[in-house]
Amino acid sequence: ASPSLAISGALAERYPKLLERLAQTPYEWLGHGWNMLCMHAGEVDAGTEAGWISDSRRALEQFTDQPIKGWLSPGRIQTANTPELLVKNGFTYHCDWVNDELPYTFKTTEGYMTCLPSCLELDDVFVLTQNLHSEDSFAQQVIDATDLLIKEGREQGGRLLALNLHPWLVGQPHRIRTVREILEALLVERGEAIWHAPPHSI
């Protein structure tokens, strides 16, 4: 598997020991804004938003030598300026939009950027806390989606399924079994049919 980590600038600033530990892993890091109060939404002016983006990137770069090329906005929310500001700050892809199962490149006024669409319908927060589905239902939904995308991939070319997990939610003792079941299904039972890719290589 190739997990990636969406990390906010405030988290890096507040918990440096955690970032030092994460820097010892091979996982790819994505910028995740400054914090969940600094939402890239509505009438936020471009200067303020640019500051959030650059500050969050610099906060992560203090702890890792890997280039921070990916972005996931807090709440997956963007302003009209977000894509351009991301390109201007050196990001090459974002995961904010939920409109496809295929990656695609688009043009901004600052250059090209790639979208790696997220699957909101399979986000653990969306399924468990908003739709109020059971943990078993969550696992089955992920497995069902994976099976269909494998079938489509064989017939029409590869598909993207990003599984977003939040440790504060699925890391609870009563949910760990569900995570293990999902990973068993994806990594072991269907492992040969899936490219477990880090985002930058897609």
What is the predicted function of each stretch?
Residues P16-E20, A50-R57, P83, T146-I150, ...:
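Generic structural signal for well-ordered alpha-helices
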Residues S8, H32, D96, A197-P199:
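Conserved beta-strand termini and adjacent loop/short-helix elements that scaffold enzyme active sites
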Residues R58-Q156:
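Active-site-adjacent pocket scaffolds in enzyme catalytic domains
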Residues R21, T25, A59-F63, L85-N89, ...:
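Alpha-helical structural signal in soluble globular domains
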Residues Y93, I143-I202:
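C-terminal domain-boundary segment and adjacent tail
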Residues S2-T79, G111, P117-Q130, A162-P167:
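Metal-dependent polysaccharide deacetylase catalytic core of the NodB/CE4 family, i.e.
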Residues V44-G51, H133-S137, H174-T178:
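Alpha-helix N-cap and loop-to-helix initiation/capping positions
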